[in-house]
């Protein structure tokens, strides 16, 4: 779709990085469309970060899928998207956002604006949600 195959090859394992008590899962662009790839089995990670190039025609899917990944994986989700025009004349409006595990948008940048959005993520609040509503215990395990 975005000609990723010309520059990237499919991975065979997820990258989860421990950082100051957090486990962070790093994914790219098109991975957002595949929920099994981001499945948070046994709460392996707390923060899911997507770095992406989603053009304006797909901005509704971008927003909906980021929120869905936060809800289904009981984690924070940060989606970082580009702005401007690419060499194929596709226009990008940004739409970078951070969602809580409740699916609430907790930080964002206005469309068409480059910049940095900041917020405080609370690991304790995330762990309390997971203890109170442990849906991950009932989830099917998928192996890729």
Question: Where are the regions that the model predicts?
Answer:
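Glycine-rich, small/acidic residue-mixed loop/short-helix segments
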Residues: 119
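CN hydrolase (nitrilase-like) catalytic-core segments centered on the catalytic cysteine
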Residues: 33-116
């Amino acid at each position: 779709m975005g000609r990723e195959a010309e520059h990237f090859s499919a991975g065979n394992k997820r990258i989860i990085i421990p950082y100051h008590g957090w486990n962070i899962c790093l994914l790219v662009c098109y991975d957002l469309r595949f929920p099994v790839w981001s499945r948070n089995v046994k709460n392996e990670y707390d923060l899911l970060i997507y770095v992406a190039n989603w053009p304006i025609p797909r901005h509704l899917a971008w927003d909906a899928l980021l929120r869905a990944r936060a809800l289904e994986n009981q984690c924070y989700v940060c989606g970082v998207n580009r702005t401007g025009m690419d060499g194929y004349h596709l226009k990008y409006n940004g739409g970078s956002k951070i969602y809580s595990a409740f699916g609430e948008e907790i930080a964002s940048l206005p469309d068409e604006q480059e910049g940095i959005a900041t917020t405080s993520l609370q690991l304790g609040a995330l762990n309390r949600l997971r203890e109170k509503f442990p849906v991950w215990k009932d989830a099917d395990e998928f192996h890729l």
